[in-house]
Amino acid sequence: MGIRENGIMLVSRERERARRLENRESIFAEPPCLLLAHRISPSPSILPAEEEVMDVSARKSQKAGREKLRREKLNEHFVELGNVLDPERPKNDKATILTDTVQLLKELTSEVNKLKSEYTALTDESRELTQEKNDLREEKTSLKSDIENLNLQYQQRLRSMSPWGAAMDHTVMMAPPPSFPYPMPIAMPPGSIPMHPSMPSYTYFGNQNPSMIPAPCPTYMPYMPPNTVVEQQSVHIPQNPGNRSREPRAKVSRESRSEKAEDSNEVATQLELKTPGSTSDKDTLQRPEKTKRCKRNNNNNSIEESSHSSKCSSSPSVRDHSSSSSVAGGQKPDDAK
């Protein structure tokens, strides 16, 4: 039994060896004649020991190759880490590279956490700002509506208080009056101006209406502004030297107009005195001559004063006109007596 079992084991070993040899033809390059010889005449004492040695050597060589490849890859990775950390420094050992990478990772994680906290704070602040913005928009719309309501109430009050408020714009009514640095003329209606409403009608003038006498003055009467405007005019007049030459002409024209008005008033008073029923003709004729001389003296004095001053006004003509009307009015009760 023992011999038979040994024979079976040898046959099985030979078969396994044949299979291994067929699979490893590149490693164990043996000619086919030797293989046939081994198959025909196997040596059971020598072949198993050689096979075991070959298997162990092959395994060791494969393991060494794998280890070499793994170390080469690790070295490449360490070189890349060193270049990322500090490419200018020389090559360090693996321990320093690992410590530097660990420290850098810790710093990066702390920065990431800090940025996350800042992001959350900024998001909360942005929400608050958006809420405030919406509140301000609502307040703005409410204020606009209040302003519109107040404007409507103001317009309604203007229309109820003044009849012309409906036709005029409230912006025009609220605007301040313009200030002119010089006197502006006022437009008067064309026609005659009532001078002496108590005088009787005379056919000499050809006017049937006793209260209306043709006015010798033009249709525009000079407008006297307040004192502030006159002072502004006195400040602005020296800047224009051309106005000095125009002032005497205007004054002369105004004096001639006032003299014409005085002559017409004197003619009217003389005709009134020549009417029947007048007792003292000589006294009444002498009075207009005296008044005329006084008026001329007043005109000369006013011209001299105006030449020294820079103010431009039409007060002398208005005063002469008022004095002539007062003289004429003062003569009427004497004549009536």
Curated annotation (Swiss-Prot):
Residues 235-337 are annotated as: Disordered. It is found in: Nucleus. It holds the Pfam family bHLH_IRO3. One of its GO terms (molecular function) is sequence-specific double-stranded DNA binding. It comes from the Eukaryota. Residues 297-317 have a biased composition (Low complexity). Residues 244-263, 280-291 have a biased composition (Basic and acidic residues). Residues 58-108 form the bHLH domain. The keyword Transmembrane does not apply. GO terms for cellular component: nucleus. GO terms for biological process: intracellular iron ion homeostasis. Expressed constitutively in roots, leaves, stems, and flowers. Keywords: DNA-binding, Nucleus, Transcription, Transcription regulation. Homodimer. This is Transcription factor bHLH121. It comes from Arabidopsis thaliana. The lineage of its organism: Eukaryota, Viridiplantae, Streptophyta, Embryophyta, Tracheophyta.
